[in-house]
């Protein structure tokens, strides 16, 4: 130990008399093994200089006794002898020991409690010789076993020279107070090989692996001098081995070199330990490990005391979200050095543009393979400080610099320069322009010219135990020589201006629990070789003015070096920043215990990386395979991680940081409640839906108290009103006014309110659809052909519909929706789109027939209708009571109708395209695109209103709450017939059309509910397929009695409603796809939307201004937009396209071209068959033929195609897209409008 005294048993009891034999006894094998396990003592070779008159060696005298005064005198004078103990470290092969027995383990544990930790991972711990003997008096059962190993041999000095003997620090020795001189004894060191008694005793060499030259026993150690090289061997030495030429009376605990690295508390402790004489009290080398020497980069460098402390306060090893910032050493306009942010990572890399100093677009970081190898070598040889307990940047920088000195990366004279460089001011692109513009990659010559012509006085405020440089460094160390104004250069000072220029928008994109990583790289002229340090703090701390946003810092990486080497510091900084942004690597960085764990994580990163050959890439098409190859590597990487998690789980333990992942997505997660799962009991699914959904009824009302719900009501109101007006006008045309806009608005309002209050999924929007419009027209033609009352027949169809719905729900038949694949959905949507397009041009053809283009129009008698039309050609006359024919042969009517139809279509279509453009902001584009239909209707109505001398047919809307044709019907439809009795056979035969309309309602409602209930949409309150189908079917029977149209769940409007109530996460990395935070599931918005649609009946005067040609344009828009999201239409275009221009889609790359075209032709054949049926008198049967496509897909197609091909051609892989620049609902859905 430092004073070289044996502690008495009990700590304060008198020291016993120690008998030291003059002859060296033979060592038994057991004694040699114990000495080898306990370590070699650190011999001091120059202790003989302190002895003026050594006693004569008497071989006949067996032993002598030492008193307490001898020990006290030796303890006092031994403090002023400088012996660098780092030159006596054990060799490398002695550092690895065999597993000790329980007794040896106990002694080694006591010994480690008296030893300070090494400063870095690469430095082995200092082991003191005789350390185990310090505890021999504490265990009585060990005295006999340790007695032989504690003997000391005395060798006679050469004649004619002063005695030069060695003693072991902490060995048994004594001094006689009356002697003029004092003999020094040394404990023999057991050698590894065969032992020779005549061979000189060799001590342990340097701790550095590169210099382990053995020291001769009598060699004189070199005293420390300012000009000597201050390396690891001279740094790691106890205070008792420091030279002091002032004599024993000078009260100096240590030299300046060690004092400048220690705090005041450590210096006071050293003074009390080394200079105060407390008799009977044994003091150790260092009471507690120094902060500088207690590097966290080594597992074995922690004493048991620290291990117990860390066990009480374990650092947080749970992985957090990451924010990485790269700062480079730059020069501002005044040629002053500062740290400048050049890139940042949340998930993807964002670089600062050179000229404009603004952030570029996020992109995947591309790294050079050489920079990764250099980074691996840097971490392997640099400093690694893990779980560093510091809370300020000056404290962290001080320990980083000291560790660099200890690990021989920088010289001691560069301490102040490196420290001041680390504490320079940090500037960011969002800050004020006080930092000025800077060159992105300044040349090394310019940096060296500036850094070589400046001078700085290092000074910074004290931080706890970190000494002030002005007090402890003496003369100021030059950082930039020859600069008298360097004292005013800004440094990083705590409590300054704080985070200037914070980007609140960026802060919103960073997760709340994120911890930052700061990367500092740059060139400096005063270093001869690169110096690096990887730091992980024990807990995240908020460092003022370092980051552009106030995010706590957990990791730091420092890389400084000269400019004359070939290392690209910018690329090396990008490499470590990209690694820290990688999910698996930063998890490994949190859990790493030493640098080997970091190196292993780099190897894992390299295993999942892609190396692109150094060849020119002419276009993006040449890089198509890179994305697919990367996805394959990521899949294998996830499989390896999953395998590791499973192995650790089976082994009975979990790796650090894996507990949360298993809790969230592990095998122990609760199974999900499948609403389509059959219970086996009658109405079992309906009961489950009621129990699942109705308990959330109070929250369905509370969750509506948000401003987002108000905005959704206004938006969906126009989205629901536009189809109601469009389909109402077309329905009035098909049914000759028996049902029109009034009936459809009332039906939408009543059924919407009831469904929102009672439905299991209140986010569904019920409304009229294209398939129901086709069925209503087919059923009307059927009734006309059979001379039946259309409205009375609908009453009996509605009653049978209720019966069939009850039977289907009671048998839990909703599970059949699983068998409806995209094969059937695409056929259904494609057919309805074709019908919409055909009906649009057919209506336009009728307009041109009634109002042909003539070379001459007669002046008189041009109007064949009512006289009122002559007075107001384009006015809004009240609807006729009887139904006279409208005017015919009107000039310019056909052309104006064509203009209105195409104008409405083009405006709505291009506003939809504008939604996905780059103009304006994302929210503004989305609002404009979503309101495209109302905007186009409004503009074309204004155009028609401004042309007063041209006739156009207007929408027929009654005044007030009235039916469309009061002279034809009333609000209540008698089931037995109004004009004549309804035939009884038709009452029974109505079951057939009821079954057909059930097929349409079932497909649209259940598929819509299935789309809304996708896992990706994050609906938490559940759905109810049985309850929703029962409500819509039962309300359909009610609609028949009042002559209202049947409704179903409208797919596009329902998805739009859910998207409007979806709350997206703001903490999304730039460039990453948006993620759903929550969906406001409630019932109030549906009730308000339906109520507002019902109140629109009072706008009859406004609705009567809408020309039918405008509705034809909306009809055309619905048909065209529905085709854009269907895969069938895309594959249809591929038939006319060469194979080399086919897109990179699974149905192209995984299926042969001719087999893909065969699948497309089968779908086209089904569509043609349905079109033929729809065009004949048997048009009512088209829903039944549509249902037959389900068994066709399940039974016939597997015989023609392989499962792999069907998976590519008929897979439901569409996910909701919430990106502001993404596609709209029409592109995501395979269902008709």
From Swiss-Prot:
Chain positions covered by the region annotation Disordered: 1-320, 431-500
Location of region: Membrane (anion exchange): 710-1233
Segments of skewed composition (Acidic residues): 137-153
Cytoplasmic-side segments: 1-709, 912-926
GO molecular function: chloride:bicarbonate antiporter activity
Pfam families: Band_3_cyto, HCO3_cotransp
Record field: transmembrane: 710-732, 738-775, 795-817, 827-848, 894-911, 927-947, 981-1003, 1029-1050, 1084-1129, 1156-1192
InterPro entries given in the database record: Anion_exchange, Anion_exchange_3, Anion_exchange_CS, Band3_cytoplasmic_dom, HCO3_transpt-like_TM_dom, HCO3_transpt_euk, PTrfase/Anion_transptr
UniProt function note: Sodium-independent anion exchanger which mediates the electroneutral exchange of chloride for bicarbonate ions across the cell membrane. May be involved in the regulation of intracellular pH, and the modulation of cardiac action potential.
Biased composition (Basic residues): 74-97, 104-113
Listed GO biological process terms: pH reduction; regulation of cardiac muscle cell action potential; regulation of intracellular pH
Gene expressing this chain: SLC4A3
UniProt biased composition (Low complexity): 201-216, 437-450
Transmembrane helix is among the record's keywords: yes
Omega-N-methylarginine, modified sites: 296
Chief localization: membrane
Biased amino acid composition, Pro residues: 1-11
UniProt GO cellular component terms: plasma membrane
Protein name, per record: Anion exchange protein 3
Glycan-linked positions: 874
Keyword S-adenosyl-L-methionine annotated: no
Lipid bilayer topology: Multi-pass membrane protein
Annotated positions of the Phosphoserine modification: 168, 171, 176, 199
Extent of Basic and acidic residues compositional bias: 58-73, 268-290, 482-500
Compartments, record wording: Cell membrane
Keywords: Anion exchange, Antiport, Cell membrane, Glycoprotein, Ion transport, Lipoprotein, Membrane, Methylation, Palmitate, Phosphoprotein, Transmembrane, Transmembrane helix, Transport
Family that this chain belongs to: Belongs to the anion exchanger (TC 2.A.31) family.
Species in which this protein is naturally found: Oryctolagus cuniculus
